[in-house]
Regions:
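Basic polycationic patches enriched in arginine
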Residues: 10-15, 42-43, 314
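Secretory targeting and sorting signals
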Residues: 2-36
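An exposed, glycine/acidic-rich loop-and-rim segment of catalytic or binding clefts
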Residues: 37, 43-410
């Protein structure tokens, strides 16, 4: 395609089965954490070592119990649900030392069980982002998935990993409060082939560093694309829109989409477009431009192809060895800065276009358009149908291995 950029192929995320998932430590504390709120006015500086606690958090309609875990380290506190692996709250200090929640979410389980939940804080699988017409062919066999986003399948379809109860184990150590989440997805689940065993580890280190490590194995060829769908507002949950946040993306290209938000197959240069975030740019600066891609997404809802080093040198390396910076988000008002590093070749920037004032958040206010944004590290949308995109295939004897680090400073 004229003007098209080369694709940053990435295969280092798959390792042989000899590098199997690490076993976790079994220790679950039972102290009940504080309730989920927005900014609480606490001042940072006290700190402390890593701690975890767990409490009941209701049950799904079929009676499956849900837990809420609280992970704390230093001035940072994170609450995680076993339902969907949801990051419900993440409390960190701002530039003045005031501690506040910087992610969007619901105060109770009912919000996450609702069909209106826009994947707040959820783990996404089996396949993050969209697959065209819910259909792909693997090794000569065509697989049909249920569709849930117009004609397409989004985030694994109805009943995806964001709607499952994961098994949680405390795997904390002296350096981090850590939680391991495990989910087994049977052959044919969501229409995907192969029994997939997925392990996701949240590791909270001081000061305000969260590592998300994904691993998965399969007993039959399949496709996998896992991500985390946290909505960020560095000024504080419920504080208004994020249009003054300044975003930098380490990407010279992005994947344009059609009217149903399926990539055309091209990786187009960002130069001269509203998609050029190679220098820090306020999110609201160009979001109202009459660009056809902006119109398709009603704002930003696109995948950027990250500028990566030569991947050939990374074959067989551990996931964390291949980490590279992907994005930097800064809020001038609070002084908070979020830096994202990842082993993935792409990142989806979604500017909260479909928040419509009908959802009540953890702080008691409603979320309107642009009140939060998602930065989802990933392989590319619709890769199973796009032979020129980095492969998302996973086969028996391989391990899906991906790491993303979120670090907040102020």
């Amino acid at each position: 395609v004229p003007g098209q950029l080369p694709l940053p192929f990435r295969t280092a995320r798959r390792r042989t089965l000899a590098a199997v998932l690490g076993a976790g430590l079994l220790a679950a504390a039972l102290a009940a954490p504080a309730g989920a709120t927005g900014g609480d006015g606490r001042r940072g500086g006290g700190g402390g070592g890593p701690t975890t606690s767990v409490e009941p958090f209701g049950a799904t309609p079929d009676g499956t119990a849900v837990e809420r875990w609280t992970l704390s380290h230093g001035d940072t506190t994170m609450r995680v649900l076993t339902y969907g692996g949801v990051i419900q709250t993440l409390e960190v200090p701002d530039g003045a030392g005031e501690v506040g929640n910087v992610v969007l979410g619901f105060a109770d389980l009912a919000g996450y069980l609702s069909e209106d939940d826009p994947y707040f804080g959820s783990l996404i699988g089996r396949y993050g982002n969209r697959i065209a017409e819910g259909r792909f062919t693997l090794d000569g066999t065509t697989h049909q998935l249920p569709v849930n986003d117009g004609p397409n399948t989004l985030h694994g379809g109805p009943g995806g990993f964001s709607e499952r109860v994961w098994t949680a184990t405390d795997v904390s150590d002296d350096e981090a409060a850590a939680l391991q989440l495990v989910l087994v997805s049977a052959d044919g689940d969501q229409g995907f082939p192969g029994t997939l065993t997925t392990t996701v580890t949240y590791r909270l280190e001081a000061p305000s560093r969260l590592t998300v490590h994904y691993q998965a194995t399969t007993d039959a060829p399949t496709v996998v694309n896992l991500t985390q769908h946290t909505y960020w507002n560095l000024a504080g949950e419920g504080s208004g829109d994020v249009y003054d946040h300044e975003l930098r993306l380490d990407a010279s290209g992005y994947t344009p989409v059609d009217e149903t938000l399926i990539p055309t197959g091209e990786v187009a240069p960002v130069d001269g477009t509203p998609f050029d975030f190679r220098e820090p740019t306020p999110i609201g600066e160009r979001i109202r431009q009459a660009d056809q891609q902006i119109l398709f997404g009603q704002g930003y809802d696109h995948n950027w192809a990250l500028d990566r080093a030569d991947d050939g040198a990374r074959e067989g390396s551990d996931s964390e060895d291949a980490l590279e910076q992907a994005a930097v988000l800064h809020d001038p008002a609070s002084g908070r800065t979020l830096t994202i590093s990842t082993t993935e070749p792409g990142i989806q920037f979604y500017s909260g276009n479909f928040l419509d004032g009908t959802l009540v958040g953890t702080g008691g206010g409603v979320y309107r358009q642009g009140d939060g944004l998602a930065l989802e590290t990933q392989h590319f949308p619709d890769s199973p149908n796009q032979p020129d995109f980095p492969s998302t295939e996973l086969r028996p004897g391989e391990v899906y291995d991906s790491t993303t680090v979120f670090e907040i400073t102020s």
